[in-house]
Amino acid sequence: MTPPPPPPPPPPSHDAGLPAGRDDELIGERIAGYLVEAEIGRGGMAVVYRARDLRLDRIVALKLLAPELARNDTFRQRFTHESRVAAAIDHPHIVPVFEAGETDGLLYIAMRYVAGADLRVLIDRRGPLDLTAAVRIGGQVASALDAAHDHDLVHRDVKPGNILVAAGTDSDHPEHVYLTDFGLTKKSLSLTGFTTVGQFVGTLDYVAPEQISGKPVDGRCDVYSLACVVQETLTGAPPFQRDDDMALLWAHQYDPPPPPSGLRPGLPGAVDGVLAKALAKSPDDRYETCLRFVAALRAAASGISDGQHAPTRVDARAGSWSATPEPPPRPPRWARPVFPGP
């Protein structure tokens, strides 16, 4: 007896094409008022497309989250709340969020489209950056992170792929850096490194020890991740490289980071101490903010020990300082008291 023919395949859906489908499955589709034009990025939780806003006729970056996330009610509520918070942050180094919502079972975020490469591509193309450029880029990222922390948002996934590098304005500002991937519920469904749908939030090369152990996290976990990124910009590789994921997680929790000056001769030795503090296993032993970390890095690059200030510039035309300075000149007549004292 001949078996019956198999049933026809189900019609294609957004769920089938989002996490693992072909790159072009959604190209040309309209989603929530946006015309999808091209895929520009893909991760474990989302896919990012270049799309055209059909209402305002502008190009945006449209991030579509994995469909299973939309089926979690708590996740959807947090997504809505945190997307609104992210959209309210007006900062020159944070990619603006235009809109976030849900359509046809998909959660989406529409953001400014930034022309340029991310830091991952930049490092792969050019190799390690010079110390001045690393400090300059790190400072812009640190400014964005601290602004987010002021709004009670912890990024949790700071990595070169989330740092966009656009053209700057002049030779003193050769690049303008944007931090992206806010508003993706990085605060998640708990205060630990895992979402309640069982997905780890973070990238293993840059993840802080407290994220691995499932402890509560705050902005200092972003200090750790930013330090991993800075070390990679200086040496060409993140602090820890291991053959398998478990060994890498162990290294973040227990192994001391390698001094960058040993990997790249010519770096000031003071840079080692700054990065060692930013990469401390305990958050209490790190810098309190990202900007304090970069300020210490800048001082180390300038040959100033931590805790000191840069020397004050003195105008040579003002003359030299004397141990017995001359008395100040008499005030003009109009500034003298009307009724002189006895």
Residue spans for each PLM region:
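Conserved short submotifs of the Hanks-type protein kinase catalytic core
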Residues: D104-D118, L122
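Activation segment signature within eukaryotic-like protein kinase domains
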Residues: I137-G138
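AlphaC helix of the eukaryotic protein kinase fold
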Residues: A66-A88
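Protein kinase glycine-rich loop
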Residues: V36-G43, V48
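Activation segment of protein kinases
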Residues: R22, R71-T74, A166-P216, D243
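Activation-segment/catalytic-loop signature of the eukaryotic protein kinase fold
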Residues: A100
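C-terminal lobe helix-coil module of Hanks-type protein kinase domains
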Residues: R52, H155, D205-G307
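Protein kinase catalytic-loop region centered on the HRD/HxD motif
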Residues: V141-L153
